Amino acid sequence: MLDAFAKVVAQADARGEFLSNTQLDALSSMVAEGNKRLDVVNKINSNASAIVTNSARALFAEQPQLIQPGGNAYTNRRMAACLRDMEIVLRYVSYAMIAGDSSVLDDRCLNGLRETYQALGTPGSSVSVAVQKMKEASVALANDLTGTPQGDCSALVAELGSYFDRAAVSVV
């Protein structure tokens, strides 16, 4: 965002002009959008533990075989690894959301994740379901406008959903 500000100022300075109302309006819109992004990410970060825990509970309620003896989340160590992985995906989704770009999610989280899960014998379809459950919880939080500036956030909510969809597809 600072690059955009610097660019507009440099252009005006090169022309020896003050910033125009149009330029100021565009920068103001960019700040407003940035504030909405921050609100969405703050809601996710503030509720990350609940998002992960509740999503895992819902997954295990639907797929109890995962937590039964022989299941991929059976034993405390495996359960902790499952929750850790869910938290990592959620964290990188929040990074992508604040950046407005999926490259950090792709490069640092998703690339090679399917292969890793296959090598470990982790069912990708179950991971995908867990990611979708985190999406549902995160989108619900993003849609809750309590205590946040008013305005249309539908594009940001759709963008947020797309990052979760990207993660869910990458593991199956």
Swiss-Prot record:
Cellular component, GO annotation: chloroplast thylakoid membrane; phycobilisome
GO biological process: photosynthesis
One Pfam family from the record: Phycobilisome
Membrane topology: Peripheral membrane protein
Modified residues (N4-methylasparagine): 72
UniProt-annotated binding residues for (2R,3E)-phycocyanobilin 1: 82
Localization: Plastid, Chloroplast thylakoid membrane
The entry's keywords: Antenna complex, Bile pigment, Chloroplast, Chromophore, Electron transport, Membrane, Methylation, Photosynthesis, Phycobilisome, Plastid, Thylakoid, Transport
Post-translational modification: Contains two covalently linked bilin chromophores.
Gene3D superfamilies cross-referenced by the UniProt entry: Phycocyanins (1.10.490.20)
Assembly and oligomerization: Heterodimer of an alpha and a beta subunit, which further assembles into trimers and the trimers into hexamers. The basic functional unit of phycobiliproteins is a ring-shaped hexamer formed from two back-to-back trimers contacting via the alpha chain subunits. The trimers are composed of alpha/beta subunit heterodimers arranged around a three-fold axis of symmetry. The phycoerythrins also contain a gamma subunit which is located in the center of the hexamer.
Family: Belongs to the phycobiliprotein family.
NCBIfam families documented for this protein: phycocy_beta
Name of this chain's protein: C-phycocyanin beta chain
Organism of this sequence: Porphyra purpurea (Red seaweed)
